[in-house]
Every structure is written in structure tokens, then in C-alpha cells.
A protein has these predicted regions:
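Solvent-exposed, conformationally flexible loop/turn segments
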Residues: 398-402, 510-519
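Accessory, solvent-exposed terminal regions and/or long lumenal/extracellular loops of proteins
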Residues: 410-511, 519
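Catalytic-domain carbohydrate-binding cleft regions of carbohydrate-active enzymes
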Residues: 1-402, 406
Length: 519
């Protein structure tokens, strides 16, 4: 199956660290983004928000009122994502462990006892997600948790990671009971799908509590088909050039495996990052389908402003480019949800017959029409044909940290204005970027809906088709098709920018009547 539509805010920039704590530090980070006018949509809470690393709890000292934290983030145009790991602290006075034990839902050892393994809270028990009763129990835990105003959920260390075993995960002879259409079996049989079964259960629990909204779940472990339940990131990378470069083929491979929303921790998670590394990373990482900055405990601050003015300015440019392209990313998310096409694509997708493109791991495509060449790329193999360099933000082509962007001949890319977060209106105005092919023609489309909820399934969306054609000394751009009963803010009005050898030529008007751009 394909990935269902995610909420639009999840295509914005995310800021995380292990950990923002206490609650006032979370709000301070949010306020700094707004003060510095660096676009951002979500702040992430790692395990320090919990009471002694007990899942589904809040630290009474650092986060005495999580509902107020979420309210204050929402007032600033942010969404929040909070971590939930699989391991529950072995503590007879802790409600999750107590109810899990009473319901007998834990994974068992080979001799039939509850398996306890060392995790963040110390000794922990682990739900058996093959067992229907365990899933029902797990799903019910989300009711009170989401009632605090939590937006997204982060299921981490769900391989599962166990610190006191030789293989750093469950013993292979642990027992999963199965049920429904899953047979009983040893952990060696179920290891690769433990995280997958966890996020499936989490999604079902979130949907039961909040059926009117689209869930957003991020997972570290997943499996083929898991895109139906969660986005997948590349895990605990390090602040080093090898991991920066490796993130491109890793994200591409996730996309080719059916998981369209993926990315690496921008700046690197482990170890300290320096300014040059971070600037280079966000310069192309802003184009990951899932774009999030993250940092490990004990490492330096890695927010966009943490490395001085030059990197702060470079980060702002990179993220402004991302937000201008939001209508294009959202259209590609819709495509992924309908036919499974990845958002981030290998360059050989543009010309499968050109075997020289097959091994390219530095440059990549966003959709069919946008070529991204990271600043670190040395002699990347690029597709032939018309690809014109594109500038979206003042200074973006002169900044040494920014990836080069090229638009494909024959394409029309929908873009919006610079916004600080997705609660603001993108399409006021809509700008269409046009690059003609050898025949003087171009086409493109835009998908738009409410950004959350399921009304698009009942026709509340707008899927618009655009064409451009050169006639004599002008290019005429038109809206040539529209499906769905939804309206977009621009009401058929648009700015058109035709990218030519002479530079960018502009015009504006009504797309139904046709917009003429004089050459």
C-alpha cells in the first residue's frame, strides 16, 4: 500500500534535540525561530520530558503542565511531537507496567517468564505487538496522552534496542504469542517487524482517539509496507562528512523501498558539529522529504542560529527555499499517496536509459522537475537535456552552502510565498515557475487541500493542471484542468515566471483566461 496523506505541517521544518527541557526551554526555542524569522513548523520532545523515562508520563518538575506547553506552541504556529518508546519501566507502582502485567501483554522469555531488558528507564518490559490483546491495551494508552494536546508521536529505539544483551536487541528465542493472522513464533522470526507492528498499533490507537485528524508518526525501525503507518528517518547518525554524504543514498533507498517521507538528522546527531558541516548539511537537507535538525545530549547546540550569523543566514535561505516549494512538495506527497512514487528520487529516474546516471549518489531529484546538486557534490552525473538554474530567494545562488537547483525543460512547478509556518497562507499568491522544452511547451500540476483531516476523500481538494506554450514572441500559461470541489486562496490568479536564457520574465493574471509573458 501507499502512504496516506500526512498533515501539511509535517512537510515543514522540524527542530529537535535530546532534549529540550524544561518546558520554558521548549518555548524559548520556538520564540527564537519566530524572532529570527527562520521558518519552522514543529518542536520535538525527546525522553527527558518523561518522569524517569516512563513512557506515557510527564516529568512533574520539567513538564508539570504539558497541555500548556502544547497550547503555547500552537499559539506560536508550532506543532509538537513527543517520543514514545516500546519499553515500559519495571515498576509495580507505575500504571503502564502495572496494567500491562495485569493484562499479561509482555513479550516472554524462552521459559515463559516476562522478558525484562535494559533500556532508558533501566529494566523494562516490552509489549508483544503480535498479540491482539497487547495491541488493544497499547492503543488505549494514547487516549490520555493525546488529550494533552500532543500533535505527533515519535516511536524510537523500536528494533527494539536492549542495552544488556550481546546482540543489543531481544534474545532470538524470546516468545511472541501471535494471534489473529499472525502465528506464535520466536523473536528471530519477528525481529525485523517489531518496529513495524509497533507503529501500526500506534497509528490505530491515535486514529481511534482522534479520527478527524491525520496522524504523524516517526519511527526508527520499519519494514516494507510500514509507510502506511509512519515516516522513517535514518537513525542516530554522527556530525561528520561521511554521514552527511551517506544521507543522500540512504534517503533515496528508503524512497525506492516505498517510504516517501524520510531524511537524516540535519547537522548530525552524535558528536559536535562545526559551522561548515552544518551549513553544508542544511543547504541540501532542507530538501529531504522529512527535514529535521537534531542533536544528542552532550553535543553542542545545532539550531540554525547556533553557529554565528553566516550559518544563520544560510539556514534561513535554505528553509525559505523549502517553504516556497511547499506547494510542490505537497503535490508530490499526494502523488506518493496515490501511486507510491518517492518524493526524493535518484537522477536516473529522469532518463532510465542513461546508464551513467545509475550510480549517482550526490545529486538527486525532487519529483521529476527539480534537480538538487548539494554544495559538496564533486562532478556529479547529471541528466542530459534542458535543466536551467533556478533562484528562489535573494542570495541563494551566491551562498556557498546552498545546493544548486535546476528546473527541467518542459515543466511547471507550483510555488508559494515565504511563510514562517504552515498555519499561514502559502498560495496568496501562487507563483508558477515555467521552463519550456525544445518545442516551446511545458506542463505541471498542483494538489491542495485543507492540510489535515480526511475531507479530501469526499472531494474537498483541488488538483489543477497547467500548460504553457510559446506563440510568436510570448508564452501563454493556462489552467487547463481542475478536479475536486476545493478552492485555493489564489482564486485562479497567479504570477508566472518563465526561466529563459535572458533571465526570469514575469507576468501575472487569471489562469483561466491565460497569462501572457512577453519574451
Amino acid at each position: 500500500g501507499t502512504m496516506p496523506m500526512i498533515p501539511r505541517w509535517a512537510l515543514g521544518y522540524h527542530q529537535s534535540r535530546f532534549s529540550y527541557s524544561p518546558d520554558r526551554r521548549v518555548i524559548e526555542i520556538a520564540d527564537t525561530f519566530r524572532l529570527k524569522r527562520i521558518p519552522c513548523d514543529a518542536i520535538w520532545m525527546d525522553i527527558d520530558y518523561m518522569d524517569g523515562y516512563r513512557i506515557f508520563t510527564f516529568n512533574p518538575q520539567g513538564f508539570p503542565n504539558p497541555k500548556a506547553v502544547n497550547r503555547d506552541l500552537h499559539l506560536r504556529g508550532f506543532h509538537s511531537t513527543w517520543m514514545i518508546d516500546p519499553g515500559a519501566k519495571v515498576d509495580p507502582n507505575y500504571f503502564v507496567y502495572k496494567s500491562g502485567t495485569e493484562n499479561d501483554i509482555w513479550v516472554k522469555t524462552a521459559d515463559g517468564k516476562d522478558f525484562n531488558g535494559d533500556a532508558w528507564p533501566g529494566a523494562a518490559a516490552f509489549p508483544d505487538f503480535t498479540y491482539p490483546k497487547a495491541n488493544k491495551w497499547w492503543q488505549n494508552l494514547y487516549k490520555d496522552f493525546l488529550a494533552q494536546g500532543v500533535d505527533g508521536v515519535w516511536n524510537d529505539v523500536n528494533e527494539p534496542q536492549i542495552n544488556d544483551t550481546p546482540n543489543k536487541t531481544m534474545p532470538e528465542d524470546n516468545i511472541h504469542r501471535g494471534g489473529g493472522n499472525l502465528p506464535a513464533g520466536k523473536h528471530i522470526q519477528y525481529h525485523n517487524v517489531y518496529g513495524f507492528l509497533m507503529v501500526k498499533s500506534s497509528r490505530e490507537g491515535i486514529m481511534a482517539v482522534r479520527p478527524e485528524k491525520r496522524p504523524f508518526i516517526l519511527t526508527r525501525s520499519n519494514f516494507l509496507g510500514g509507510q502506511r503507518y509512519a515516516a522513517t528517518w535514518t537513525g542516530d547518525n554522527g556530525s561528520c562528512w561521511d554521514h552527511l554524504k551517506m544521507s543522500v543514498p540512504m534517503s533515496l533507498t528508503l524512497g525506492l523501498s516505498g517510504q516517501p517521507i524520510s531524511g537524516a538528522d540535519i547537522g548530525g546527531f552524535l558528536f559536535n558539529a562545526d559551522a561548515d558541516l552544518f551549513g553544508n548539511w542544511i543547504g541540501f537537507g532542507a530538501f529531504y522529504p522529512f527535514a529535521r535538525g537534531h542533536a544528542c545530549a552532550g553535543t553542542n547546540n545545532k539550531e540554525p542560529w547556533a553557529f554565528g550569523k553566516e550559518i544563520e543566514d544560510a539556514s534561513r535561505i535554505a528553509l525559505e527555499r523549502r517553504y516556497i516549494l511547499l506547494p510542490y512538495f505537497y503535490t508530490l506527497m499526494h502523488e506518493a499517496s496515490t501511486n507510491g512514487m518517492p518524493i526524493m528520487r535518484p537522477v536516473f529516474f529522469s532518463d532510465p536509459k542513461d546508464l551513467s546516471l545509475r550510480a549517482e549518489e550526490e545529486a538527486f531529484l525532487i519529483g521529476d522537475d527539480l534537480l538538487i546538486i548539494p554544495a559538496f557534490a564533486s562532478q556529479p552525473a547529471l541528466p542530459k537535456g534542458i535543466w536551467k538554474e533556478l533562484s528562489l530567494v535573494n542570495g541563494d545562488t551566491n551562498d556557498k552552502y546552498q545546493a544548486k537547483m535546476k528546473i527541467r525543460g518542459g515543466s511547471i512547478i507550483p510555488t508559494g510565498k515565504i511563510i514562517q509556518n504552515t498555519t499561514e497562507s502559502s498560495l496568496d499568491p501562487l507563483t508558477l515557475l515555467v521552463c519550456l522544452d525544445e518545442q516551446g511547451k511545458a506542463s505541471g500540476s498542483m494538489y491542495w487541500d485543507a492540510g489535515d483531516g480526511w475531507s479530501y476523500k469526499k472531494g474537498d481538494y483541488s488538483l489543477q493542471q497547467f500548460t504553457a506554450e510559446r506563440k510568436d514572441n510570448k508564452v501563454i500559461v493556462k489552467l487547463t484542468g481542475k478536479t475536486g470541489k476545493g478552492e485555493t486562496e489564489n482564486k485562479d490568479m497567479a504570477i508566472v515566471k518563465v526561466i529563459t536564457e535572458k533571465g526570469i520574465l514575469h507576468a501575472s493574471g487569471n489562469l483561466l483566461e491565460g497569462i501572457e509573458v512577453k519574451l
